[in-house]
């Protein structure tokens, strides 16, 4: 099985459904024999440029290990989910479990408050 990093940009009006959306994708991955090594919710962030006249969006990121069939099923679900504005799937060399830079920055900001 290969390792992938998936980043999702979700419509801000659908932020309340992010939890159920992630559970659905987790179920697809685990029933296909895959594993989720890291799952992060970056929250609402400003977009670098507007997408469909939207200036903020909810960001999600996960590192998974799965085969091509599961990845195709996930990609199909991402494509036909209107709540997902953009998705990015990157192939990784190995397992990544350390917090991302975004989460490290978020933790630093919480520490200052």
Swiss-Prot record:
GO terms for molecular function: small ribosomal subunit rRNA binding; structural constituent of ribosome. One of its GO terms (biological process) is translation. InterPro entries: Ribosomal_bS6 (IPR000529), Ribosomal_bS6_CS (IPR020815), Ribosomal_bS6_sf (IPR035980), Ribosomal_S6_plastid/chlpt (IPR020814), Transl_elong_EF1B/ribsomal_bS6 (IPR014717). Disulfide bonds: none annotated. CDD domains: bS6 (cd00473). GO terms for cellular component: cytosolic small ribosomal subunit. The keyword Hydrolase does not apply. Keywords: Ribonucleoprotein, Ribosomal protein, RNA-binding, rRNA-binding. Pfam families: Ribosomal_S6 (PF01250). Belongs to the bacterial ribosomal protein bS6 family. Binds together with bS18 to 16S ribosomal RNA. This is Small ribosomal subunit protein bS6.
């Amino acid at each position: 099985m290969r390792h992938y990093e998936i980043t999702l940009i979700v419509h801000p009006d659908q932020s309340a459904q992010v939890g159920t959306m992630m559970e659905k994708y987790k179920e697809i991955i685990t029933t296909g024999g895959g594993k989720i090594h890291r799952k992060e919710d970056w929250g609402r962030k400003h977009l670098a440029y507007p997408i469909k006249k939207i200036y903020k969006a909810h960001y999600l990121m996960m590192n998974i290990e799965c085969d091509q069939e599961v990845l195709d099923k996930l990609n199909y679900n991402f494509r036909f989910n209107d709540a997902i504005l953009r998705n990015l799937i990157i192939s990784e060399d190995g397992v990544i479990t350390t917090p991302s830079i975004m989460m490290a920055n978020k933790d630093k900001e919480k520490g200052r408050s």
